[in-house]
Each structure stands twice: as structure tokens, then as C-alpha cells.
Amino acid sequence: MNQRKPANNSLIDNCLTLTGIVTSIVKQSQSPLGIPNYSFWLEHRSNKMEVNLERQVWCKIQVILNGCQFSLITQQIKLGDKVKISGFIHTHKDYNGLSKLVLHTEQIEFIDQEKPNGTLFPSS
């Protein structure tokens, strides 16, 4: 039987940039290793052309921010804020064992807002 070899992970790209409205308050927790974890829900709505037809696009995704570098940024995130998130997608299992797609944040930018420092990136 001919088996397929797994793809080389260095050739697989996983990046997503999504702009939307914050629809929940930021929740904070801590990993067993003591790493701060933050999360909130982002709702995206737009119109896109597909096969010469305009399509209304909508999605709601949980945004995850892991690490101390996000502690100040998350204090500024409020319900209704428009943000641009760049990061990677990953599957999380909830308490019922159901899988859901989440967006792990690498960069966050406030859009059309009077926020200090404009674009906010995690510090290295």
C-alpha cells in the first residue's frame, strides 16, 4: 500500500489577519506553567466578490493572547473596539470535547481609535 508522507512543516504557512469588532470583555486566566492567557471574541463582517457575485461575509472567532507581553494591551481592549489581529489559527477543544477554531494573536492594532502608541505589538 502506498502511504503519503507528512508534509514538511517548514513549508506549511499558517497566518491569518482579520479585522473586526470586539464582542466580549477580555477574560484572563493562567496556564499551569504560570503564563498569563487572555481571550475575547471578535466578529468580522464584510462584502467580498466571489465568481462575479457579491457575498456577505461573517464570522465570529475567539482570539487568544498568551504571555506577559499582552498584559498592557489587553487592559485597553473594550467592547465595540475595532481591531486588526494578525496571528495563526489553531484548534481548541472545549469542556464538552467539541473542537473550535481559534486565532492566536501575534500582533494587534486598534483601528480608528484614539489609543496610545497607535499600533500595539507585543514586546520581544
From Swiss-Prot:
Domain SSB: 12-112
This protein's UniProt keywords: DNA replication, DNA-binding, Primosome
A single cellular component GO annotation: primosome complex
DNA-binding keyword on record: yes
Biological processes, Gene Ontology terms: DNA replication, synthesis of primer
InterPro entries xref list: NA-bd_OB-fold, Primosome_PriB/ssb, Prisomal_replication_PriB
Database matches in PROSITE patterns: SSB
Disulfide bonds: none
A GO term for molecular function: single-stranded DNA binding
Subunit structure: Homodimer. Interacts with PriA and DnaT. Component of the replication restart primosome. Primosome assembly occurs via a 'hand-off' mechanism. PriA binds to replication forks, subsequently PriB then DnaT bind; DnaT then displaces ssDNA to generate the helicase loading substrate.
Family membership: Belongs to the PriB family.
Role noted for this protein: Involved in the restart of stalled replication forks, which reloads the replicative helicase on sites other than the origin of replication; the PriA-PriB pathway is the major replication restart pathway. During primosome assembly it facilitates complex formation between PriA and DnaT on DNA; stabilizes PriA on DNA. Stimulates the DNA unwinding activity of PriA helicase.
Listed name of the protein: Replication restart protein PriB
Organism (species): Haemophilus ducreyi (strain 35000HP / ATCC 700724)
